[in-house]
Amino acid sequence: MVTWSDIQRWNPSALTSAGSSLRSLRTTLLTTCQDAEAAERAVLSRGLTVTQAREVLRGLTKKHTRLVNEVSELMMATVEAADGVGDVQTLVLECTQYAQTHPELTLNADGSVDYPKRDVTMGDLTDSRGPSGDACHAALTERDANELKSLVTKALARAVEVDEAYGKRLDALTNGTYTCVETSGTHSPGLPNQPQAGWSPTQVAFWWASLTQAEKQAIITE
């Protein structure tokens, strides 16, 4: 359960750093996979030992292809989460700034909002000259409190969305339900060949930066 006190400490920097490390790992794995494929193609001799060598190389290629796909998925899931955490950080800042600019409101550590309640009489509301100053002030304070509550709710809802989306993708990688049919021979193993609907500019930029020069060229000329 994500709480208000939790998200006040959220910061995307650690996830962004992890995404960059995973990008480097993907490049290394992809190179190893391509080297194994090249080694298999280079074996032209025949015989039992050569056949066994080819089988070993094919096995290594298959394993590295799977690793490339899984690391690519983990990388993009982490970048998506970092983007979401950045959203939450912005929403939390919006809440705290709103509370600071409305000094009658108190934003508590648990995300609840307090404000001074004023006793407003019927006379304050029905005076022939219009509602009294106390009545108007009380109404404005309550309106501001409700606005701050709404901002807190929005921040928490986004935090839950980010947390659940990242957890779902991690679970799929952990329990083996994540599937990817791409191989080292496709344009961008483990990654889509085009930016996906719903991606933020940050995700698109990271996806493009994650591609090797050969992958970029293959996508451009496709």
Residue ranges of predicted features:
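Residues that cap or delimit alpha-helices
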Residues: 11, 200, 212-215, 222
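Glycosyltransferase catalytic domains, chiefly GT-A lineage
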Residues: 207-211
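N-terminal secretion-targeting helices of virulence/extracellular proteins
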Residues: 1-190, 194-206
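Short, charge- and proline-biased low-complexity linear segments
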Residues: 35, 220-222
